[in-house]
Every structure is written in structure tokens, then in C-alpha cells.
Design a protein with these regions (language model features):
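Short, amphipathic alpha-helical "recognition" segments used to contact nucleic acids or chromatin
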Residues: 1
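Short amphipathic alpha-helical interaction segments
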Residues: 12-25
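Nucleic-acid-binding surface
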Residues: 4-9, 24, 32, 36-179
Length: 179
């Protein structure tokens, strides 16, 4: 995990947490979240730390597009949470609570710039979310996303998602204008 050590992983290997506490005191590791430490000479991965702290967070919208390699990194991190989970949301994340169907459709994994695996939505779902929530995107970002992602998207899967989210018309219009 690129310099990360999880306390739970140490416990599984019957290694006492006191060793990690000692190494933290010596400056070898630093605590970045409850139960998660990072080696001194490694840079923090904000996506991995957020995923570690909030296991049910799924990166969405522009953050998903970035993690999928479709857009440059954005200042704001966005993610979806299931209903009734952390009802206050997450500090520093533009989070939105969604129902089970919306939460699970298009779930995928992506590798962060630091090499860690985190949950996000697949390319097809990210394209549809740009159409469903255009107010969350800059117009240029939607156009850039469609130009880079639509040619390689699975068109049948895109249609399946559009039908599930009742946005076939928006997709057809976007394909005519941007695709």
C-alpha cells in the first residue's frame, strides 16, 4: 500500500501495536487516520486515506473521471454514500447520499496516482452522471469527458445504465452534440 501500515493487518500477523507506536515516536511512521500509519518518506494519498476512513465512500463525478484517467485532477473531491450512512456527510468531500440501486450501478475500482486501489464508478456511469447532474460540472468538462470517454465506452452498457436512470433522451442528445 505504498508505505501504509494498517493496525488491523498487524493484529492479523500477531504483531503488537506497541511496535508501531514506538516507530511513530521515533519518526519512522506518522498516523494519518485512526488505525492507519504512513512511512515518513512517503507522500499521503488523499483518495486512499478517505477510502480507508470511510469504507462505503465511492468516488464519483469529476473525481471518478480523474481516477479513470479521463480528466485532470479537480480541487474538489466528490463521492456517493449509501442512504443512512454518515448522514452528516464527510468533511472536505462533496458527498451525496443515494439509494441502493444508484449506489451500486457501475461500481468499479481505479488505481490512484500513488498506486492504491479505491472504489469509483466505471466510465459509462461517469458519463451518465455528467448528464444527470450537469450543475455539478463545468460545461467544458462535460464536453472533454465525452470526447475522451465516449469512443471507448461500452455502448450497450451505457444504454443499460441510461434506461435504469431514465435518461435515454439526455444520452441521445449528448451523443448527437458531443459524441
Amino acid at each position: 500500500h505504498d508505505g501504509y501500515v494498517e493496525v488491523a493487518a498487524l493484529r492479523e500477523q500477531n504483531i503488537a501495536q506497541t511496535y508501531l507506536s514506538y516507530m511513530e515516536k521515533e519518526g519512522i511512521f506518522r498516523k494519518v487516520a485512526k488505525g492507519l500509519y504512513l512511512k515518513r518518506d512517503h507522500h499521503e494519498d488523499p483518495y486512499y486515506v478517505l477510502h480507508y476512513r470511510y469504507k462505503k465512500l465511492v468516488f464519483s463525478l469529476q473525481t471518478s473521471a480523474f481516477l479513470q484517467g479521463l480528466l485532470p485532477e479537480q480541487k474538489e473531491i466528490s463521492g456517493y454514500l449509501p442512504l443512512n450512512y454518515l448522514t452528516q456527510g464527510i468533511s472536505g468531500v462533496a458527498s451525496r447520499h443515494v439509494g441502493q440501486k444508484e449506489f451500486t450501478l457501475g461500481l468499479s475500482l481505479a488505481v490512484t496516482p500513488r498506486g492504491n486501489l479505491v472504489p469509483c464508478y466505471d466510465v459509462e456511469r461517469t458519463l451518465l452522471d455528467a448528464l444527470r447532474y450537469p450543475e455539478k460540472w463545468e460545461k467544458e468538462a462535460i464536453a472533454a469527458l465525452f470526447k475522451s470517454a465516449y469512443p471507448k465506452a461500452d455502448k450497450a452498457l451505457l444504454q443499460t445504465y441510461a434506461k435504469a436512470f431514465h435518461c435515454e433522451g439526455e444520452l441521445a442528445l449528448a451523443v448527437r452534440l458531443l459524441g
